[in-house]
Amino acid sequence: MAAAAMAAALRACAAAVARQDAAWRAALAAWAPLLGALGGLAAQMRAARRLAWGGSPLGAFGGLRARLWRKQRGAAEAALEQLGGRRAELRAVRDAVAAAVGAVLRLYEERAAELGLAAALRRGPRCPSLAEALEGLQDVERHYRHLYLESKLLLLRVSCDSLAEMEALPQSWERILERYKPDVVQVRVVLLTRLLRENSVH
């Protein structure tokens, strides 16, 4: 039966999103300290650039400035490499959610005629219609996709040659997160769970 297949697909998708959201949150939690470390390093590197080395006692140590720069740059590159690994984790979640949501949408397209428009639009007193649940799943997929893209673009702009931008990374990241609230995912999953629990798809 189309309705039973649809319910099974929705249930599997909800479980997949819940699993992937936990992985997403774990990856995101690692970003703030790494970006904070990069911001701190950038501040130190800018301060070292401004320092009048020749007119200070440190000027007696001819290679100190270059050694310090290499050490700081190496630390920045190591933090960026770690962030790259975390970004790969975000990409894996994005892809897994896209696959799960895509499977549900394809099934609906295949079985839409059999399900009928009335079934797709029928709502319970406390749960959404199937059409609303499908729209919510697309919102979830879009949330992960857009936030992943923002994280990718943020890291692409980072360079030891642009220390002011690197120093502002923690604030830039916070502004991004403010635009992508995690409750977008939670609310949609709760609504989908209600739909399944109250057997609006049966």
Each predicted region: which residue ranges?
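Charged, alpha-helical coiled-coil and adjacent rod-like segments in eukaryotic scaffold subunits
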Residues: 99-202
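N-terminal alpha-helical scaffolding segments that mark the starts
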Residues: 1-44, 202
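Extended, amphipathic alpha-helical coiled-coil scaffold segments used for oligomerization/tethering
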Residues: 4-11, 35-139, 164
